[in-house]
């Protein structure tokens, strides 16, 4: 069941609601204007929500800064509030105060109603097992870009000593005594499973060792938060994370790292529209793989202390061969926005998606807009991946440049939705992009930012 903005109204998260104007859920985009100007990106969606969950583990208040006003933050705020955490958010300052001193069990029906379209609820397991000895986790939402199983998560929790009971509408978990540290190797360096293990191990008894862990910058920032809270965690260079469990954790004060997915999305928009955009809050170190690719395609950038400027230098863009991967590779979430820019590159580009098996569904609408994109089951252009033998259309060949023309399109998922905005901005004529509230999940004030960059957009 998906939560609507109304669902949050009784909670103290009003400023997070964002667009609730009652207007139609669509944006008209008059394409053809190069994006130009300066915008700011705040904290990373895929870190902020996890740090908020981590606050549950502390005995004292936490303060998180640089928090964007996006729907995923509202969903997590709602769930934390239901469990007795006092949440106060100031959208203008981007500061969220979290007081977990009165944590309590929530009613199943309410949890279900507040889970929204997010995957974050699964990360409540460890903290709730430590705080309350039990947890109910509703069926998860999230973007339809693959099957997105949670088998690694459940295996981790079972090994720590939790009883996992799948019920209609969700999963009930119970701690059989104090959770105990484990030694485990992930079959794949999953971001969520690594976070699950971290949030559970920090207060489990004894040592936990995870091999083949994900080491995304958002995970490292979560580890920094947990260390501030009193955890003992080391990260080795070979994807091994070791955690010494402690009895108590306190609150934290932390400033979230910037959203490198949002930054790369705007950079791709600058490239696809022939524009010039400076992104405050974008940082080189977390975006190195993207910057290399941006340069290979023919885009230019300039790194400054507080921002990165991205622009199209004029002339043709170059086709590339690209493979998505876990960090430090090219992020899967950068793929969809960049593919739109690749429709404007000369020659054949090959993109091999190795993180999600179904992340090219969004290309249907791009084809409708004039792009020439073919999808293949084979692993093209790189080493075979785990999807190669499984019949998934996970490689794309993009032939360009092709002029894009306006169309009426429906947002399929968060990043695919932003890609449609980029395509509509690059296209000739007036496009209608429907279902834009999905984009609110991860892009703060995107309409205002579009307008600030000179885009001709209006709500339906
Ligand atoms: N996987 C399993 N079993 C599991 C968990 C994962 O097979 O129990 C598989 C997935 O099906 C997928 C792969 O492992 O094929 C990677 O999934 P991962 O667990 O790393 O992804 P996630 O934690 O569900 C987060 C982000 C995604 C981002 C990925 C990869 C959040 C809330 N989501 O998802 O972000 O694409 O890591 O970096 O942090 C987005 O922001 O639009 C988004 C989809």
Q: Where are the model-predicted features located?
A:
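Short, structured segments at the rim of ligand-binding sites
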Residues: 2-460
